[in-house]
UniProtKB/Swiss-Prot annotation:
Pfam families: Hexapep_2 (PF14602), THDPS_N_2 (PF14805). It is an enzyme of class 2 (transferase). One of its GO terms (cellular component) is cytoplasm. It comes from Parvibaculum lavamentivorans (strain DS-1 / DSM 13023 / NCIMB 13966). Keywords: Acyltransferase, Amino-acid biosynthesis, Cytoplasm, Diaminopimelate biosynthesis, Lysine biosynthesis, Repeat, Transferase. Substrate binds at R108, D145. InterPro entries: DapD_Trfase_Hexpep_rpt_fam (IPR005664), Hexapep (IPR001451), THP_succinylTrfase_dom1 (IPR023180), THP_succinylTrfase_N_sf (IPR037133), Trans_hexapeptide_repeat (IPR050179), Trimer_LpxA-like_sf (IPR011004). NCBIfam families: dapD, PRK11830.1. Disulfide bonds: none annotated. GO terms for molecular function: 2,3,4,5-tetrahydropyridine-2,6-dicarboxylate N-succinyltransferase activity. This is 2,3,4,5-tetrahydropyridine-2,6-dicarboxylate N-succinyltransferase. Its EC number is 2.3.1.117. GO terms for biological process: diaminopimelate biosynthetic process; lysine biosynthetic process via diaminopimelate.
């Protein structure tokens, strides 16, 4: 079936998801498997940019969710120790892969990198020991550094750097309407977290320890403009705080966390955050 043919089948199945289980056969199972294969190969993605705006294909997210009802628990090779397994419903992307498959895929996956089936990893990506969840899309030339987690259906652009310990939120639990999107050429500093469908605009730089959710205020220090849910392109963002209102007795109330845009990316910023082409040969 074509992608356009899969969509109505999956949408109908999702409406009747209480009737879907591991014994379900036929059209629904075939449609979900085809959708997951399309995500896994990069032929489809949960979100795409169209005429300057991001469009979310909710039916592909539905396919990911339905797969949990369709698939029973089973052993997955690669557990700790010799001849041991994991126990889950989602197989590894690398199940059955050998040298030929890795060479064709064109990315690096060092020991300790875990990718679940239906996540797409583009050529010239580097996966350090990290976790990429199902339905995610990691585009060309991106570095996924040590202990990074890329959540379900998250969209990571080209030539990004996700520094050590970064967390990119998923859509499955708690259930989110839209995935987190990191656009091309972004730098996400160590231990930062971006969740709840936030969009980080192209070329933006988040310093170490920046936490952004759908309700976090992102304040431009120069203009006072407040952004919520999206980091403007080419912004340099650091953690900050907003002063609390005074208590009834006049004492200061606790301040509230926010993010602060301190400047626009310049040559000095680019020099500090540039990707290393030597690591992608």
């Amino acid at each position: 079936m074509s992608l356009s043919d899969l969509k109505p089948v999956i949408e109908r199945a999702f409406e009747n998801r209480d009737q879907i289980n591991a014994q379900t056969k036929g059209e629904v199972r075939d449609a979900v498997n085809e959708a997951l294969n399309a995500l896994d190969s990069g032929k489809a993605r949960v979100a795409e940019k169209f005429q300057g705006s991001w469009e979310v294909h909710q039916w592909l997210k539905m396919a990911v969710l339905l797969s949990f009802r369709l698939n029973d628990m089973s052993t997955i090779a690669g557990g700790p120790g010799e001849n041991t397994n994991w126990w889950d419903k989602v197989p590894s992307k690398f199940e059955g892969w050998g040298e030929a498959e890795f060479r064709k895929a064109g990315f690096r996956a060092v020991p300790g990198a875990i990718v679940r089936r239906s996540a797409y990893i583009a050529p010239n990506v580097v996966l350090m020991p990290s976790f990429v969840n199902l339905g995610a899309h990691v585009d060309e030339g991106t570095m996924v550094d040590t202990w990074v987690t890329v959540g379900s259906c998250a969209q990571i652009g080209k030539n990004c750097h996700l520094s050590g310990g970064v967390g990119i939120g998923g859509v499955l639990e708690p259930l989110q309407a839209n995935p987190v999107i990191i656009e091309d050429n972004c730098f996400i500093g160590a231990r930062s977290e971006v969740v709840e469908g936030v969009i980080v605009g192209e070329g933006a730089v988040l310093s170490m320890g920046v936490f952004i959710s759908a309700s976090t205020k992102i304040i431009d220090r120069a203009t006072g403009e407040v952004h919520i849910g999206k980091v403007p392109p080419y912004s340099v963002v650091v953690p900050g705080s907003l002063p609390g209102k005074a208590n009834p007795d006049g004492s200061p109330a606790p301040s509230l966390y926010c993010c602060v845009i301190v400047k626009t990316v310049d040559a000095q910023t680019r020099a500090k955050t540039a990707i290393n082409e030597l690591l992608r040969d």
